[in-house]
Curated annotation (Swiss-Prot):
Protein's name in the database: Isoleucine--tRNA ligase
Positions with a binding annotation for L-isoleucyl-5'-AMP: 562
Span of the annotated motif 'KMSKS' region: 603-607
EC number: 6.1.1.5
Record note on domains: IleRS has two distinct active sites: one for aminoacylation and one for editing. The misactivated valine is translocated from the active site to the editing site, which sterically excludes the correctly activated isoleucine. The single editing site contains two valyl binding pockets, one specific for each substrate (Val-AMP or Val-tRNA(Ile)).
Catalytic reaction list: tRNA(Ile) + L-isoleucine + ATP = L-isoleucyl-tRNA(Ile) + AMP + diphosphate
InterPro entries the record matches: aa-tRNA-synth_I_CS (IPR001412), aa-tRNA-synth_Ia (IPR002300), Anticodon_Ile_BEm (IPR033708), Ile-tRNA-ligase (IPR002301), Ile-tRNA-ligase_type1 (IPR023585), Ile-tRNA_ligase (IPR050081), M/V/L/I-tRNA-synth_anticd-bd (IPR013155), Rossmann-like_a/b/a_fold (IPR014729)
Subcellular location: Cytoplasm
UniProt-listed Pfam families: Anticodon_1, tRNA-synt_1, zf-FPG_IleRS
Amino acid sequence: MTDYKNTLNLPETGFPMRGDLAKREPAMLQNWHDKKLYQKIREASKGKRSFILHDGPPYANGNIHLGHAVNHILKDIINKSKTAMGFDTPYVPGWDCHGLPIELKVEGLVGKPNENISASEFRQKCREYAKEQVDGQKADFMRLGILGDWDNPYLTMNFDTEAHIIRTLGKVIANGHLYKGSKPVHWCLDCGSSLAEAEVEYEDKVSPSIYVRFSAVDPVAVEAKFNAQGKGSGQISAVIWTTTPWTLPSNRAIALNSELEYQLVQFGDERVILATELVEAVQKVTGVEQVEVLGSAKGSDLELMRFNHPFYDFSVPFILGDHVTTDGGTGLVHTAPDHGLDDYIVGQKYKLEMAGLVANDGKFISTTPFFAGKGVFETNDLVLEKLKETGALLKLERIKHSYPHCWRHKTPIIFRATPQWFIGMETQGLRKQALGEIKRVRWIPSWGEARIDTMVANRPDWCISRQRTWGVPMTMFVHNETEQLHPRTLEILEEVAKRVEQAGIQAWWDLDPKEVLGEEDAKIYRKVPDTLDVWFDSGSTYASVVQQRPEFNGNSADMYLEGSDQHRGWFMSSLMLSTATDNKAPYNQVLTHGFTVDEKGRKMSKSLGNVIVPSEVWNKNGADILRLWVASTDYTGEIAVSHNILNSAGDTYRRIRNTARFLLANLNGFDPKRDLVKPEEMIALDRWAVSCALDAQNDIKEAYDNYQFHTVVQRLMRFCSIEMGSFYLDIIKDRQYTTKADSLARRSCQTALWHISEALVRWIAPILSFTADEIWGYLPQVEGRSEFVFTEEFYTDLFGLSESDKLDDNYWQKLLKVRAEVNRVLEQARNDKLIGAALEAKVTVYANDDIRPLLEQLGNELGFVLITSQAIVKPLAEADVAEGELAGLAVKVERADGEKCPRCWHYATDIGANAEHAEICGRCVENVVGEGETRNFA
């Protein structure tokens, strides 16, 4: 028996079936590093349109978590897809390196500055610690396959960056946005410092809920205002409600709404003043049964009436404020200008005293009656005792409510007035201009615009000063008596910035004021001891990084991309500073993604045991699986992840890899320069396959352009699984394996596979970067080919069907449906044990007048499309079987005629017709020793 195996064109490739990504990826990374891949991309992109995705700096503390991985993978997908679209996409990764978390870590190692170690040594230790953290995170980001200038990242602690942060402060001052004020700010007792809006979290807290009496100084005058002379009996009191009893020592007024109606009410054996709308609610809370309205008055008529403080020997006025509502409480608001923003604002209007009773450590100062030296929260109970003692406590409850907490310490914070430096939202029209700039930016998803618009519209002035050791100093001098900035402040800032550029921020702390002020001014001006809020550091990177790095060529950022929490963080601080200094937003587009949750929608937490660490994934599955999971998910909402979800991503990966392997294996022996077939000479099915790839590419490019990466993956899977896997690649196996190696039938097919491979590898490169790099190395080599797929643009040699193609896309789509119906009937026959493999079948397709001409066009090649040994087409009227699931079609399956050919596995009736090759069918004889069979369609 002759062995015809060596007459077949069997698929062959060194491209492995298994990805083994965890093992192979590190070697690829090393190759990228050794070959300077990032620099090669920059060189290949010179002169092209730029696209700048500016990296929001992660904080240089701790290992990267899954959220970091999601963020940087999304950025990398965008940069690589933009490169493939013909853009120059320089990417400079960065890190946020100053601030309290690093201070706390270093304190744990070496102790507090100025206690266990000098401040200058402490700063150096902070710098060293931050550098270690950056190096660790950098290695992790690189392991994810993210390309960027990792050798030259930006760090906010780089000397030149620190200098430019100081210069940005100078611009803020020059444009009139900075002022000093004693204003209530979020204050963390554990940090010993003010907090930015973005550093505040809200958690549930149990607090005392109290109703407090302020007795009237002149009860007769009160009766007159309410037109209730001589009515009722007992003491007259204004009743306030609060959940912060410790702020009562700082009370300096009671606020009413000028438009609300208030009533004087007989409340048991006393008389109280309440907002009309809240009388019933307060009665219910206090349990007072006897209630009678004695008179009413408008808030505006009660202004400046005075009431006695509940335990101090002074009285406070009624004042009017728009912030007073009837959403809860009594409609009369306890006002302590030191401890609330609304209180402060209305207090400024009425020139109320700022009591200043609470020190930096959260304890009452030594001159505070009754509470000196006590912490604010322990004072709550002491105040309650005092209120009971004076008879001022009307009602006490305990409630659970949402309360601001420090994001680092997870402890309750307070509002506290301290002397701080602010960027004014109303000065020079900053708020109005920022709101206008928001409208100019493209927000992705679109709801981001309304979110940041509301935040900017309602945000307070930005407190940019901090009382910390490790931070960029506010390099200013103020007058010892007037507290005014030195008249040469801008000049001094630039002089100090130059020194910082050479020696870092320590240059400021080491600076003798006489060096920049002269002998006389140094006597009357002192250094500002504060450092800048770290949000100022990162918020000014549009100036300290984007405007400085040569690869950006002076262009502003096209995109900022971070988690959705950054509307109130980095997006906000960047917008405020850029508008204040440059009169424009620092970005053209802002894209946000959601947070990672488990498959049940729960946050990642150690206590739930659902935390997935990125390194565990790449060590087990490979970084490409992590990248594919990120790309497959709609990042605009919460991003679900679990081991099951990652396994599903692995299944998707295998489908793509198997498709690539089939393509590569069947390009064995193909030399594009020698063997490429012109489109007009290609077989109809092959031309259609290339046109399918063109359609897929157009969809994929559009999805990349719209940052819809899950759509890219879905379209890719449709192409690999439906159009290719279950149709085209299945059909061509016979032609690939059995026709003459150099025949038009085979070379036409290989030409299609070549074009498809060249396109496919570019489609997946932004997402499956390691796998694309691997595929690139196994593709048939052509002259002038780039060493790496990442320097290439999307493939441009795909082509669509021409108008002269009778078998257009509509034709092949109908044929796909016919084939699906035939496969359904074949599967039934297989289940009925009539046949085993499809090639054991002869099918008779009974078709109506619409479908039959389509099938008849293929002639004897219909069997190759249906992958049956014989296929006959007859009118539907002749059918002796019922119509199936496709209207107008009935399919009859019988055992194929003839014997099985050992070479092509088709059943044929002409086996033995050729004496020299009696074992194989006539078609195989033609392909082995003749001119080779002719194919026109499939």
